Curated annotation (Swiss-Prot):
One of its GO terms (biological process) is error-free translesion synthesis. InterPro entries: ApaG_domain, ApaG_sf, Uncharacterised_ApaG. This is Protein ApaG. It comes from the Bacteria. Pfam families: DUF525. NCBIfam families: PRK05461.1 (NF003967).
Amino acid sequence: MINAPRVCVQIQSFYVESQSEPDEERFVFAYTVTVRNLGRHEVQLLGRYWLITNGNGRQTEVQGEGVVGEQPIIEPGGEFQYTSGAVMETPLGTMEGHYHMVDHQSKAFQVPIPVFRLAIPSLIH
């Protein structure tokens, strides 16, 4: 799409050891997402789609309105940051997906969320 709004997504994930129970195959991860509007007009995040893949290859799809209960409007040069989480039965997995957004003229567009890893620190070299 030519003239598509310029939106950048950055993600940092981390293992939440205090809420995890490895002996019961429960691994809790959190991730902080920063959505930046690099364009000249405001954009609004309306919904999300996630594809979560655990270490055994089992996939779970999650979709819904907004993020953390919000549908933020992001001004030009602005950003929106939030933290959320995922629970898996393996110590390693990935997440990826896209955001459903609209531009200042209410035209819908998608912003891809690049694949990122969820892993306990001892598995990362």
